[in-house]
């Protein structure tokens, strides 16, 4: 993340195509070290691409990802107390535990595809 943040800072500073040295100097200015492998990967993936278009494409992809917020079942409303009313039985639900797959970690898409 810090490599991406440094890259974006360079772009915001007016450098439309930051180099590895540009990103490294930004990271070193705050006492952070650059991971060479991640830096080279980032630079190769963003080579000849407009960062605003990359961000727009990312937003579009994220808009298609479900973010939870599903309906919540609150159950039936409580019955008015009556003399002969039997207590409502509670239905027990079993929760299935699903194993998390590797592809679930990136929510089904790569940052640079």
UniProtKB/Swiss-Prot annotation:
<dbReference type="GO" id="GO:0022625">
    <property type="term" value="C:cytosolic large ribosomal subunit"/>
</dbReference>
<protein>
    <recommendedName>
        <fullName>Large ribosomal subunit protein P2B</fullName>
    </recommendedName>
</protein>
<keyword id="KW-0689">Ribosomal protein</keyword>
<dbReference type="InterPro" id="IPR027534">
    <property type="entry name" value="Ribosomal_P1/P2"/>
</dbReference>
<dbReference type="GO" id="GO:0003735">
    <property type="term" value="F:structural constituent of ribosome"/>
</dbReference>
<dbReference type="GO" id="GO:0044877">
    <property type="term" value="F:protein-containing complex binding"/>
</dbReference>
<comment type="function">
    <text>Plays an important role in the elongation step of protein synthesis.</text>
</comment>
<dbReference type="Pfam" id="PF00428">
    <property type="entry name" value="Ribosomal_60s"/>
</dbReference>
<dbReference type="InterPro" id="IPR044076">
    <property type="entry name" value="Ribosomal_P2"/>
</dbReference>
<dbReference type="GO" id="GO:0002182">
    <property type="term" value="P:cytoplasmic translational elongation"/>
</dbReference>
<comment type="similarity">
    <text>Belongs to the eukaryotic ribosomal protein P1/P2 family.</text>
</comment>
<feature type="compositionally biased region" description="Basic and acidic residues">
    <location>
        <begin position="89"/>
        <end position="99"/>
    </location>
</feature>
<keyword id="KW-0597">Phosphoprotein</keyword>
<dbReference type="InterPro" id="IPR038716">
    <property type="entry name" value="P1/P2_N_sf"/>
</dbReference>
<comment type="subunit">
    <text>P1 and P2 exist as dimers at the large ribosomal subunit.</text>
</comment>
<feature type="region of interest" description="Disordered">
    <location>
        <begin position="66"/>
        <end position="113"/>
    </location>
</feature>
<keyword id="KW-0687">Ribonucleoprotein</keyword>
């Amino acid at each position: 993340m810090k490599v991406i943040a440094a890259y974006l800072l360079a772009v915001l500073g007016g450098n439309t195509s930051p180099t590895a040295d540009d990103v490294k100097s930004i990271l070193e200015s705050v006492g952070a070290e650059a991971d060479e492998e991640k830096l080279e990967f980032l630079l190769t993936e963003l080579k000849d691409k407009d960062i605003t278009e990359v961000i727009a494409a990312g937003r579009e992809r994220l808009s298609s990802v479900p973010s939870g917020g599903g309906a919540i079942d609150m159950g039936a409303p409580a019955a008015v107390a009556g003399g002969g009313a039997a207590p409502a039985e509670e239905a027990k639900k079993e929760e299935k535990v699903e194993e998390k797959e590797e592809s679930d970690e990136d929510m089904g898409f790569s940052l640079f595809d």
